[in-house]
Every structure is written in structure tokens, then in C-alpha cells.
């Protein structure tokens, strides 16, 4: 138990182009070694490519993609009577968002396109249409939770 009161979460500022906190969080997820300008260039370039390909507003396509990626359930390990059980549990809203963004960037990096902008744009478009590796990861997590539904009564 912590002796002091719990620490308040820091609020991120919305980005300048889309006035969205979600875009800022995505930039922070993409960022490596504190290179925020590079991360911004990657994301805004990816959004331009999304607009070229889909002829739709990129922020709307991005929101659709994130909704398709964010997990509703996950499994957590819990030790009961000397055995470990995979217990399905609901995912908190903040964790849903951070997992979705993390998976989007992670699976975009694994794609075969030339630049990171192209990789991210393709992954966003695929996720918005319900395909893509990030959506497969979510479905895999949901399948694991469904398979271990019998242990749900161990939830804490």
C-alpha cells in the first residue's frame, strides 16, 4: 500500500493540426529517443497518404481503425492453489487505448513497405477495414479470453 495519495495522471495537450489528444498520444507512441518532430512528420505523412488513398478525412479513418484494434477483454495470470490460471477480465478504457496505439505502431513497423509513413498508413487503412495484423492480435486476445471463460469466477 502506498503511504501517500495516488499520483494524478498527466494530461497530454492536443496536437496543432487535428486538435486531438489521441493524435498526440499516437505521436508519443511512435516517438523514439525523444525525437518528437520526426514522429510528428511520420504520423502527419501517414495521414496524408490515408487521405490520398481513401479520399476520406484521415482522423475519421484513424478513429475507425483504433475502434477495431482496441481490446474489450484480456487474460491475466493468477496463481490459485499452486496453479496458474489465465483469467479473462475487462480492459480499462485507458489501457484499451494505449494497447490499441501500441499494437498499431508495433505491427506497422513489421510491414514490408519502404517508409514508416507508408507502413503506418497501410496499417491504419487495413485496421479500419477490419484486416491487418493489429486486428488479428485483438481477435487472438479475445479468443484466449473466450477459451478461458470457465475461470472467470476467479476474477479479483
UniProtKB/Swiss-Prot annotation:
Alphabetized SUPFAM superfamilies for the sequence: Ribosomal protein S7 (SSF47973)
Gene3D superfamilies documented for this protein: Ribosomal protein S7 domain (1.10.455.10)
Keywords: Ribonucleoprotein, Ribosomal protein, RNA-binding, rRNA-binding, tRNA-binding
GO biological process: translation
Keyword rRNA-binding: yes
GO cellular component: small ribosomal subunit
InterPro entries reported in the protein's UniProt record: Ribosomal_uS7, Ribosomal_uS7_bac/org-type, Ribosomal_uS7_CS, Ribosomal_uS7_dom, Ribosomal_uS7_dom_sf
One function term, GO molecular function aspect: rRNA binding
Function according to Swiss-Prot or TrEMBL: One of the primary rRNA binding proteins, it binds directly to 16S rRNA where it nucleates assembly of the head domain of the 30S subunit. Is located at the subunit interface close to the decoding center, probably blocks exit of the E-site tRNA.
Binding partners and assembly: Part of the 30S ribosomal subunit. Contacts proteins S9 and S11.
Family, as annotated: Belongs to the universal ribosomal protein uS7 family.
The protein, known as: Small ribosomal subunit protein uS7
Organism, scientific name: Phytoplasma mali (strain AT)
Gene this chain is encoded by: rpsG
Amino acid at each position: 500500500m502506498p503511504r501517500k495519495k495516488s499520483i494524478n495522471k498527466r494530461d497530454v495537450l492536443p496536437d496543432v493540426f487535428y486538435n486531438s489528444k489521441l493524435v498526440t498520444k499516437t505521436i508519443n507512441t511512435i516517438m523514439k529517443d525523444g525525437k518528437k518532430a520526426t514522429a510528428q512528420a511520420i504520423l502527419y505523412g501517414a495521414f496524408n497518404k490515408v487521405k490520398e488513398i481513401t479520399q476520406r478525412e484521415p482522423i475519421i479513418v484513424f478513429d475507425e481503425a483504433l475502434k477495431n484494434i482496441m481490446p474489450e477483454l484480456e487474460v491475466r495470470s493468477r496463481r490459485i492453489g499452486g496453479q496458474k490460471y489465465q483469467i479473462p477480465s475487462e480492459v480499462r478504457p485507458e489501457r484499451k487505448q494505449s494497447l490499441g496505439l501500441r499494437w498499431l505502431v508495433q505491427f506497422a513497423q513489421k510491414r514490408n513497405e519502404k517508409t514508416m509513413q507508408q507502413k503506418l498508413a497501410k496499417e491504419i487503412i487495413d485496421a479500419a477495414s477490419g484486416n491487418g495484423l493489429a486486428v488479428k492480435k485483438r481477435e487472438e486476445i479475445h479468443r484466449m479470453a473466450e477459451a478461458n471463460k470457465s475461470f472467470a469466477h476467479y476474477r479479483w
